[in-house]
Swiss-Prot record:
Localization terms from the record: Cytoplasm, P-body
One cellular-component annotation, GO: P-body
Full protein name: ATP-dependent RNA helicase DHH1
UniProt keyword annotation of ATP-binding present: yes
Residues covered by the Helicase ATP-binding domain: 42-212
Description of its domains: The Q motif is unique to and characteristic of the DEAD box family of RNA helicases and controls ATP binding and hydrolysis.
Entry coiled-coil feature ranges: none
Catalytic activity, reaction form: ATP + H2O = ADP + phosphate + H(+)
Organism: Chaetomium globosum (strain ATCC 6205 / CBS 148.51 / DSM 1962 / NBRC 6347 / NRRL 1970) (Soil fungus)
Chain ranges of the Helicase C-terminal domain: 222-382
The organism's taxonomic lineage, starting at the top: Eukaryota, Fungi, Dikarya, Ascomycota, Pezizomycotina
Family from the record: Belongs to the DEAD box helicase family. DDX6/DHH1 subfamily.
Amino acid sequence: MDRDVTNTKGLDFEDFGLKRDLLMGIFEAGFEKPSPIQEESIPVALVGRDILARAKNGTGKTAAFVIPALEKINPKVSKIQCLILVPTRELAMQTSQVCKTLGKHLGINVMVTTGGTGLRDDIVRLQDPVHIVVGTPGRILDLAGKQVADLSECPMFIMDEADKLLSIEFTPVIEQLLRFHPKDRQVMLFSATFPISVKDFSDKNMTSPYEINLMDELTLRGITQYYAYVEEKQKVHCLNTLFSKLQINQSIIFCNSTNRVELLAKKITELGYSCFYSHAKMAQQARNRVFHDFRNGVCRNLVCSDLLTRGIDIQAVNVVINFDFPKNAETYLHRIGRSGRYGHLGLAINLINWDDRFNLYNIERDLGTEIQPIPQTIDKSLYVYENPESIPRPISNLKPAGIQQQQQLSIPSTAVGRLAGTGPPKRFWSVWPSRPRRVPRQSRPLWWPPWRTFPRLPARAGWAPELRRPARWPCAGPKPADIPCSAGLGLSLSHLFGALGGVLTIAISSPP
């Protein structure tokens, strides 16, 4: 554990005066002592004051607002008493699960609602008592506008990842949602970065908020950052070298576009490593399944876009690889924050090319950190978990177990910061099929790239093997499946015309 979560005042959860049932849920979930952000925010939230909290990724921000919300909710009142807004569907599912886990002894009903799911199901669920609603802004505004979700008596308005929710795309929706709440509501904002838009929102909609800033530096101390300078066509070869050398519990590989996500996932699968992929254009059910399986350790590697950069907490992830280098410091900060969760160690490796050199300089300047060139040897103690039992087991049907046993990273390099491997590099774009035959979605595994094709079906009895079509004419000799279609057709025509000739001869020679 590093100082980001251990540098506390020495308080215990019992010191906050929480309900006994809530304390039972907290301790059963594995919490021992509150983190710094929880020590600062829980007492202030319990007295009903607005909060503007800024803390690093992976330091316990979710529990910092869920615990006081659960404490203040009255289960006997069948009204929505807390609204938690998040920017992504996966984060909504994760936050709702935290609410259910911590409050399982309180008799509190938690509902999660996001876009991409049936509106009818949400309407039916809101007919029953719901105390906490977790969701994305657009869907909740839709429910409130249809007068299905009654927010007129909802005293708590919480925004996680507030910097994203107060961007240009979400701000109009947030402003409309606030009109459904009472004027004496309690507003709490939590995030790792606070742009100027957050200050404008707090001045307009918050009453003397209590400001918490635990960001003496932006990046987590437990995350070691390196970059490797490679050409674009050598990135996959470089990634293969990293997989074979690093001791990876679970890894997340980020790309800048959805097309590259799917193509890279296909390449990783061809290299023999278990791999899932996820991006915003996938069906919601498929995204949920991928997120659930990866979180449970079904697979070691996940390729994704910036969809999973915010709030996703998978503590088994110890390596983050930026296959495509991000364009700004905010995206970079949230990407590498997927490793090193809650005081654990993590490793961030960035594959950069000539066009990324200015972005690298700008990110180092904005974050006040230095990204080192990758050394020839990376010490395991910088990123390997101390407790091996917490490491999820990957699937083993794609590659023998030995391929996943990585040693210390010892990479021959001809120049500092350049990662080289043995053997000729493979072109990244050289395997695109000329005419892809898509697999039906209902029979396709979730991690199977959509351009994977079925093997060609063998010839069936009664089908000509050359043209894969039924032989239309009966023919003597072997079965139609054993002879060319043209041969069968020729024999059949000769017999036909022979028979017709005999009929015509009889007809002509017969007397009138």
